[in-house]
Design a protein with these regions (language model features):
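Conserved short alpha-helical segments that host acidic/polar catalytic motifs at enzyme active sites
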Residues: 1-245
């Protein structure tokens, strides 16, 4: 009995040594409604458990992008009307940050925005890229300048460097070069785009609210606004939504 107790003690797993499960960021996107920013804020509120370090929303009004990124919780930053009034447009994406890579700085809070050749892009990303450091080092040697320490910027840089002609194919070209788990909600040239990694490691669902289509990390973000769940985005799938039209 004593030997058995010693054996069990040797392999005892202490709670303090077990890594906590963290959802690691939440993403949301919606296209086709004048209330895009407000509905994005509600969706992020439902996804708050996925990240509490910071939150952000980027909207597009047909001509310009509008961005608000803050430290703290969604309820502390996006419940007042004046905050949402700045975020005009029928398309919006949002992000709750739980830092998996990069430090606690406002620059690392998403969605990121970049004005690229071929069109502007804003991106919200949940996941970890296993080859991000390698790609980053390679691009820095070739002259790239990074503004953040987040692996998400690696995707933006790859899109910027792509030789493809249009922004959608630039994004697909970038996705072909990254490894790891990811779920993306992107605005590019007035279009909402969703993408999920080939293994489906990170969740991403498609929903509909009236005439608007929605991308979200979980169905709870659909439930809070009364949206209908359509299906999960499939492994390795890229979905393109332009206002109320969807192309797969």
């Amino acid at each position: 009995m004593k030997n058995r107790q010693n054996f069990l003690k040797k392999f005892e797993v202490r709670q303090s040594h077990v890594p906590r499960f963290n959802e690691e960021c939440g993403v949301f996107g919606i296209s086709g409604t004048k209330d895009a920013a407000a509905l994005t804020a509600l969706g992020l509120h439902a996804l708050q458990h996925r990240g509490q370090e910071g939150c952000g929303i980027v909207s597009y009004d047909g001509n310009s992008y509008h961005s608000e990124r803050k430290f703290g919780l969604v309820g502390d930053n996006f419940t007042k009307k004046h905050s949402l009034d700045k975020l005009k447009g029928k398309i919006a994406i949002g992000h709750n940050r739980y830092s998996t890579t990069g430090g606690e700085t406002i620059r690392n809070i998403q969605p990121f925005y970049a004005d690229l050749h071929g069109g502007a892009i804003s991106i919200a990303h949940n996941g970890n890229l296993t080859n991000a450091l390698l790609l980053r080092e390679q691009m820095v040697r070739e002259g790239a300048i990074f503004q953040t320490t987040s692996d998400t910027e690696t995707i933006v840089q790859l899109v910027a460097r792509s030789k493809k002609k249009d922004i959608l194919n630039k994004i697909i070209d970038a996705l072909m070069q990254i490894q790891g788990g990811y779920a993306l909600s992107i605005i590019a040239n007035g279009t909402l785009i969703g993408a999920r990694d080939p293994l489906g490691i990170r969740p991403l669902v498609l929903g509909k609210f009236k005439n608007a289509f929605i991308l979200a990390s979980e169905t709870c973000a659909l439930d809070i606004i009364g949206a209908k769940f359509i299906r999960e985005i499939e492994n390795g799938e890229v979905v393109v939504i332009k206002l109320s039209l969807i192309h797969i």
